[in-house]
């Protein structure tokens, strides 16, 4: 390659700082930026949902202990890569589907009516506009309306929790959040088995080796079994990562009990309030007994 770059280097270049970039790379980066924005606008028109949920990057000391947390970089070069990946994933899934080749899809079912009605009721109780049975376009408008406001994190979290979980399956369900009818994971075969399956299917297609029973060409039933397994292992890995991250942060906070923390309310129950740290991204429960001497009454609708 001509030059290896970080997201931060590309971001600085796109903002006018050209010092670290080789001249022959500059036109390519500018073209990538322009193309990504064109793709993003088209996908916005199609109804793609952009959830704004900042990730926390842990800061470690020399001994390997967590000493702080900071917002992970989310500059536009990340979106450039995301747009290109989504295009590649969709293009490959479309080619395989149009040739009737069984393929492992990344599917994201539409939210159920009951959940959407509850979401609308909650959002409307906060003074925000949303139809009683919101569609994807109205959810997109809601997320755009709260972007950059104090309520952004809370609204993005409740929208996320109203969504079904994405999964791996050969079924033709589509991907709701991406507004894509044909979608499969293709761009990360070194870390996801689903991508490797799609690479194998594409390899068979390009070689014209499509006879039934080929080791690299599982049928739909085999794909369904594999899909259930890798969906389970994906969720297990995500849960393990989340739990480890929480434990490391709690170890850091052990000597900070009693200090104030900037949080957002993420849920209410009859026994307390769930809050999430804006900086660290972990969630905890504030029990009613800890809220002071006032009288509190839980109203599930408000």
Predicted ranges, named:
Residues 1-302:
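Conserved, carboxylate-rich catalytic/transport cores that coordinate ions
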